[in-house]
């Protein structure tokens, strides 16, 4: 039995890329929850295309720092946040098999926001579509579309 090492190397590279993409998506979510805005920024390209139109924010290209500031301002009013992003489906744009420079990752969205003065929690459920690009520092989110299936609670945190 012979082993095609180039094919094996390609398959290993694909697994490494998939793992790095999923890790980037998870770091995006956990950085939000921890308020680690430098880590959050490191998951994004500059500029980054954001489409949160289903939540009321029209799709637009943002300078990375502008989007980080926007996210920080909107999320830090909540005392606690939990963003869960499971069920990752990664597909690659195979211009160069085994060394793709772009990929797509779809993941579920479960975002819970808590404030002690709110009447309950604010929950969002749906999914994300991430367009990922390979950069000198690894994979990063170049475009993000948020799809909302349903929400519960009041999206406006008390401003006490």
Language-model segments: what does each one mean?
Residues 37-109:
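A solvent-exposed, acidic/Ser-Thr-rich amphipathic alpha-helical stretch
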Residues 30-31, 71, 131:
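Intrinsically disordered, low-complexity regions enriched in Ser/Pro/Gly/Gln/His and often acidic
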Residues 1-30, 34-38, 42:
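Short, low-complexity N-terminal intrinsically disordered segments enriched in polar/charged residues
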Residues 11, 15, 58-61, 119:
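Charge-dense, low-complexity intrinsically disordered segments
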Residues 2-9, 76-160:
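A beta-strand edge to alpha-helix "cap/lid" segment located at domain peripheries
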